[in-house]
């Protein structure tokens, strides 16, 4: 089984075209365990397999416990009617989930619609860390 950093590195090596530099908006390419733009801005894959694009930390009120409860609600069908509506439009599509939290909604959608490689962004490190589990 691959380590998280190895999974993250493999993803950026095959899907770097999904990303643009948040600083200068240039295209990015994989360079070892990082995404690098033409201007030299570098974003390293963390040990948890994630990328951190913000230029400073943002304090949020969202903690691990809140994201765990959110995951339970989604996994147990709270948004199933919405997932059912989205599924026909998402088949084999790339999805960008902005504000993905711990990633359970995108994961549920992928299980129903077989998505192309997709990406979730969130400002909460706790949510992203859970998403990478």
Predicted segments with their positions:
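Class I SAM-dependent methyltransferase Rossmann-like catalytic core
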Residues: 60-81
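Conserved SAM-binding loop
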Residues: 131
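Conserved SAM-binding loop of SAM-dependent methyltransferases across substrates and taxa
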Residues: 102-114
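Short beta-strand element of Class I
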Residues: 116-119
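Conserved alpha-helix/loop element of class I SAM-dependent methyltransferases that forms part
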Residues: 76-92
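Conserved class I S-adenosyl-L-methionine
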Residues: 92-101
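Conserved SAM/SAH-binding beta-strand->alpha-helix loop
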Residues: 122-126
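N-terminal auxiliary segments of SAM/dcSAM-dependent transferases
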Residues: 2-59
